[in-house]
Amino acid sequence: MSLSTSLRLLRLLPAISSTATLQFALDEHLIFGTWMGSFLRPHVNITLPTWWTHGGRRWQWILIIGYPLNYLFGILNLVARYDQLQSTGSTIWYVLGLFFSVGHMLFVKMALGRIAAIEKGVPKDNVRVSMGKWLQMNWVRALITDLPAWICWIMAAVSAM
């Protein structure tokens, strides 16, 4: 692979990796939101805490790998042929993409607190309340961090090409 082709691929990688993390956030909202349906209400308090605890072990790798890849690819783009980024005006897009993606981590404490409440079945006999709070936080987080990061990195890649 030529250096030019490698650089073009590097310019695309943040958009590709952030597509995966944004998709995961949307999947979480759609799939986890099913627990809020009235048809599951009789089973939620018994099933949801265990489901979340065991499920979290299965899907945590997406978060552990996905977001650091976003950061790595964003930083690599800012150091590889910086002069090219400057000349195309794409530097700001890579910086903003990195900024918004890192912003996702500002929600970690809140997210972990809400997850702990779900896993402990809090409030007793109505864990749907905790799930609703987590879903709301997840939606806001996706809209103000993941979506803008994805848009910025697409703009960065398009302007750098």
UniProtKB/Swiss-Prot annotation:
It is found in: Membrane. It is a multi-pass membrane protein. Its main location: membrane. It is an enzyme of class 1 (oxidoreductase). The chain crosses the membrane at residues 59-79, 92-112, 139-159. The keyword Phosphoprotein does not apply. GO terms for cellular component: membrane. Keywords: Glycoprotein, Membrane, Oxidoreductase, Signal, Transmembrane, Transmembrane helix, Virulence. One of its GO terms (molecular function) is oxidoreductase activity. Glycans are attached at residue 45. Residues 1-18 form the signal peptide. Pathway: Mycotoxin biosynthesis. Its EC number is 1.14.-.-. Epoxidase; part of the gene cluster that mediates the biosynthesis of GKK1032, fungal natural products containing a macrocyclic para-cyclophane connected to a decahydrofluorene ring system that show potent antitumor activities. Within the pathway, gkaX functions synergistically with gkaB and gkaZ to form the cyclophane. The pathway begins with the PKS-NRPS gkaA which, with the help of the trans-enoyl reductase gkaC, synthesizes the polyketide-tyrosyl acyl thioester product which can be reductively off-loaded by the terminal reductase (R) domain in gkaA. Belongs to the epoxidase xenD family. This is Epoxidase gkaX. The lineage of its organism: Eukaryota, Fungi, Dikarya, Ascomycota, Pezizomycotina. The gene is gkaX.
